Amino acid sequence: TEGALYHALGDELSAYVESYSFTSLAETLLRRYGGAAVPTLSEAGRAVLVRRAMDEMMDKVVYYSRQRRSAAFCQKAAETISELKSAGIRPETLADYANAPGADKDKLGELALIFGTYETLLAQTAMDPGDRVELAAKSLDQAFFAGRTVYIDEFDTFNHSKRAMLAAMLPVADVTVSLCCDQAPDLADDGVFSGARRVANTLKSMAASAGVPCKEIRLTQDMRHKDAPVLAELGLLLADPTYTPEAEVDPAAPAITYYKADSRQAEAKAVAAAVKARARAGVPYNKMAVICRTVDQYLLQVRYEF
């Protein structure tokens, strides 16, 4: 990112721009406002802390009593706690849910106890990686962002700690978030871009809660594919089947073949045939790649055909 900024802005202007990830921004803020010296737990450290939490609970561990000595269980429990914290769920919230009608009270209730004990021990020793971002958001002086312009790119979701950082920016900074989205955010479906639309709606709600005006800008010029005009043409064609491509296509050697299949197996078979034809034409196998949107859904079919 730093290299791209320097290339675009040059020596003079690039000196006025700083590039951060949420993690590196959090570290900068913690060094300024305090908290940077607190160690961060590694994955192994989180699993060890889960084990310590269960030892602290002693005979309160009933549902998971058989797994309490299992390293694999402690690792899985640590991952679960990390996911809960990313979603902004606290131990008391999980405990309330455990008592809800239809919930697995024994399982979730005990997990809530483990989670709570884990958090108590954690506060005495270190921080989770996500906690550092949230702590930085809570401790910063709003003057840090005052008058700044913030651009956020290449995100399709924001967890609880990142939303806390965004909430700290919104009242004082001019914030722009770019999302890859094919329709207006208020159109709901389960398509490829539905997650981005949900994020857009969340950001709008956050802005409204902060009393900050929000403006939606739709970019129609395809800058991403300016060096790949064939892909740009394909994008326009997929968006509008009535679109007439500007470039002449040689039927004998198309740059892109768009194939409609009845099943994943048929997709894999067609791709395998295309790869075989390219290989016979002299293209080395190490110059070809097969890319699936979701590997787990296509792995069996691809392995069978290849």
Task: Please describe what each predicted stretch is.
Residues T1, S21-T23, L179-Q183, T220-Q221, ...:
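A short beta-strand-to-loop transition that corresponds to the Sensor-1 phosphate-sensing loop
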Residues L140, A208-E305:
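Helicase P-loop NTPase motor core
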Residues E2-H7, L29-R32, H160-A167, L187-R197, ...:
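A short acidic (Asp/Glu
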Residues T1-A95, N99-G102, D106:
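Conserved P-loop NTPase-based nucleic-acid remodeling module centered on helicase motor cores
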Residues S42-R46, T93-S209, C214-L219, K260-A266:
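Conserved helicase NTPase motor core
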Residues H7-L13, A167-P171, R280, R303-F306:
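Short, surface-exposed basic-aromatic patches at helix termini and helix-loop junctions that form
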Residues T149, D153, P171-T176, V249, ...:
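C-terminal RecA-like lobe
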